[in-house]
Amino acid sequence: CSEKTEGCIREIDCPLADAQLVMLHTLYFKGAWTDKFDPAQTRTETFRGNLREVAVPMMHDRQRAGYAATESFTAVSLPYGNEAYSMLLVLPAAGTDMAQAGRALADGAWKELTSRLYGAQVDLKLPKFELAYDTSLIEMLQEMGIHDAFSGEADFSGLTPDPLYFNVFKQQSVLRVDERGTEAASVTWAGLDTSLPEGGEEPVA
């Protein structure tokens, strides 16, 4: 994992020694801003989150970027390098909680924002931050309708003749944003065994 993610994720936080079969997928991205932030302009300020306020190193710059605004959201698109890729930053209107914002973006607000982007001079204040995320994907996959893979109905005969089931399916991600750009990595792994995940269905005889 460390080699594939350039050291962002050194090891996965899950024992797989007893798994009969392991599936592993890695992603890595590193992009430099087209217009970098000046570290001398970074200073500690208050960031107002959904539940609390925290002091963070806040980056400042005035640059031309993609910009869009609706009654519910404001968005800025910051390009990397030759502008083949960009980061879209979305700020919900005051008083909007994250769950409500997430539902709105999934229901079409994201598409509306991206269709409204236009070039503008923008005064930017962006936190310098690092995030780490580790979660099981089993519940999410089951909510999407994937059930057999975690039960006695699983059929992986194309991979192995053994009657195996997914007993772990996890993802670990890291995101870093600073004055130079963005670095991100993700590792998704699944372990198959003859045992079932907690709460899984019993094998069908």
Model-derived regions: residue spans:
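Secretory/exported precursors with cleavable N-terminal leaders
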Residues: 1-205
